Design a protein with these regions (language model features):
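Short, conserved charged micro-motifs
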Residues: 14-21, 54-59
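Major-groove DNA-recognition helix of helix-turn-helix-type DNA-binding domains
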Residues: 95-130
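A short, structured beta-strand/loop element
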Residues: 19-43
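A short, exposed loop/beta-hairpin motif centered on an aromatic-Gly-Thr core
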Residues: 43-53, 124
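Short, low-order "capping/linker" segments at domain edges
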Residues: 53-60, 84-101
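A short, Lys/Arg-enriched interface patch at domain edges and termini
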Residues: 133-191
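Short glycine-/aliphatic-rich beta-strand segments at the starts of folded cytosolic domains
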Residues: 1-14
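Conserved short beta-strand edge segments in small beta-sheet-based binding/regulatory domains
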Residues: 33-39, 64-81
Length: 197
């Protein structure tokens, strides 16, 4: 079993609902492995470090735990997924190894020539482009920007988590449930990508 780190953001039924009212219920429902953000009325965020066999199992069990405590809550976002260059540099520096925003920007704009493959395209372009974190982490490993075996195993867990999150966020944006066959396909992709690293 491994630890998977992710954040779930929920909208509460009443926009004036105080999220502090749900702290005990969340703890009793099995969310004792989460830091709960209660700063805004009408919404609640939970930052999980959940032990599970797979990222999919960690995320789905966390969602089920929250919904058992707050059945009327609506899942609106999972993170980490879309990030700008600063956020990418921060998460890599915090969890794996030192990396500057300038380095990520240079990778993204092709200013660093020593790369086996092109940097992944931005998922959202514009003045502040956003990338899927999992795609950037994959690129960093393939291009040996992250190369220590002990770090790569941690990166692979985060990539698995972000791929699962991407599927859930897509379903949320399309206002659909995550179909069982999609989850099964995602698990196969995750497993095959992990084997090929």
């Amino acid at each position: 079993m491994s630890d998977y780190e992710f954040t779930l953001r929920f909208q509460l039924q009443d926009e004036n609902d105080n999220p502090e009212n749900y702290l005990d219920l969340l703890f009793e429902a099995g969310c004792d492995d989460a830091l709960v953000g209660v700063g805004s009325l009408g919404s609640i965020s939970l930052n999980f470090t959940r032990e599970a066999l797979t990222a999919s199992a960690a995320v789905t069990s966390a969602i089920q735990n929250v919904l058992s405590a707050i059945p009327s809550a609506i899942l609106i976002e999972l993170a980490p997924d879309l990030m700008n260059t600063t956020e990418i540099a921060d998460i890599i520096s915090d969890r794996f190894q030192k990396l500057t925003r300038q380095a990520v920007r240079k990778y993204a704009t092709g200013q660093i020539a020593r790369a086996k493959t092109r940097f992944p395209p931005a998922a959202i372009s514009g003045s502040q482009p956003l990338w899927h974190l999992g795609e950037v982490l994959d690129w960093m490993v393939i291009n040996e920007k992250i190369s220590k075996p002990s770090v790569i195993s941690k990166v692979n867990r985060l990539v698995e988590t972000t791929q699962t999150i991407k599927i859930f966020n897509t379903a949320i944006q399309q206002n659909t449930d995550v179909p069982d066959d999609l989850l099964a396909a995602a698990k196969e992709i995750i497993i095959s990508q992990t084997i090929h690293r």
